[in-house]
Amino acid sequence: MRLNLSSQIVLNKVPVEFYKPKTTVEYSEISRMEKIHTDIFASMAEGASHVADKIEAGIKAAQQEGKFYVMALGSGSSLYSVYDELVRRYNEKTLSFRNVVVFNAYEYYPLQKDSSLRTINQLKDRFLNHVDVAEQNIFTLDGFVAQDAVQDSCRLYEQRIKTFGGLDVALLGVGRSGNIAANEPGSGIQSMTRIILIGNTSREEMENSEQTKETIPPCSLTMGIATLLSAKSIYLTAWGEEKAEIMQKVVENSITDTLPASFLQTHPNAHVVIDLGAAHHLTRIEHPWLVTSCQWSDKLVRSALVWLCQKLGKPILKLTNKDYNENGLSELLALYGSAYNANIKIFNDLQHTITGWPGGKPNADDTYRPERATPFPKKVIVFSPHPDDDVISMGGTIRRLVQQNHDV
């Protein structure tokens, strides 16, 4: 039986060349809007395997040189698939972690005795307890330290990192507010390990992700932006459409302290690793005509013209040749001969998607209808809802299908 089919159900298939270019030149062309090196994969599993490959190579290179491999590790859920892959390789005896030193990227503060919220426990449960990292090589920020000793504790953490020769790699996730580790919006690029107040957005995420009724503490102790940027290499992972908006800002927008992850743009060896869902709003995926030549399917042409209408605030039938040329769509003029021809074609296509018979109208000419007339009635399967279903009136569509006697 084939499992995990949900990740393979795709309504908008992205051409492979947009996310997996064959050459460095092709990558340079399609990624020119991106300010951090970004690798896009068809699935989370492929992306996690890619990151694990890089970590494995680093660990083995350090082993050959008789050195420690020093890692800063986040505990967010986006890293679980990477940790699972590393554990799998350890279990298959292809990788040892005996030379690895781990520094936890952040910890909640203050913690109550026997708290279930400790991020280091999450790291151990998911990863460290399943591999051969020496216990004495695992370090974490102290969520129990007295308030008057917090600053000294943070300075000691920085010193311990330096004692091991600095960070070789930082593995990070990203929050909805663009936070990395627990660096909230407003964190400066020079910030070191410190105490920080947890923001409302981060608190909501934490409360949703923690499998406990225990109250999230008000603060965190976190590696600072400067601490993370001191790593020789950095990998930032994100999966799924819910991360698409923030990843577009992190990768393509300007650096700002309101988006801490954007500081990774200053690092020469920072890598963003995401799946197609999280890459959805990147220019090369959502608006590929702005960065490369396209194979123009009807669907892509419709997407381009709807985008152009929204950008210019014009109805489709009023778009001109100049509008096309000045907005990266000159290829469509060559394809259709003129803006007028393209406008009429796509206007008619869009018009024919509107119907009061979503299952097809029986005993009617279906030449220009979006759904065929036969067979009737049809058997209709509705998969799990999407956040945008209310916008496209999916509830009304389902109701109409039932009213028109389809087997829903």
For the regions a language model picked out, list residue spans one by one:
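ATP/nucleoside-binding phosphotransfer catalytic cores, i.e., glycine-rich phosphate-binding loops
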Residues: 2-10, 25, 226, 232-332
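N-terminal glycine-/serine-/threonine-rich phosphate-binding loop
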Residues: 2-70, 365-369, 374
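Ligand-binding beta-strand-loop-alpha-helix segment within the catalytic cores
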Residues: 22-35, 95-169, 295
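Glycine-rich N-terminal segment of FAD-binding domains in flavoprotein oxidoreductases
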Residues: 65-92
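Glycine-rich beta-strand-to-loop/alpha-helix junction loops that act as flexible
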Residues: 73-78, 172-176, 239
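Short internal beta-strands
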Residues: 99-107, 238, 271-276, 408
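Class I SAM-dependent methyltransferase SAM-binding "motif I" and its flanking Rossmann-like core
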Residues: 181-225
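Active-site rim/loop-helix segments in enzyme catalytic domains that contact anionic ligands
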Residues: 326-408
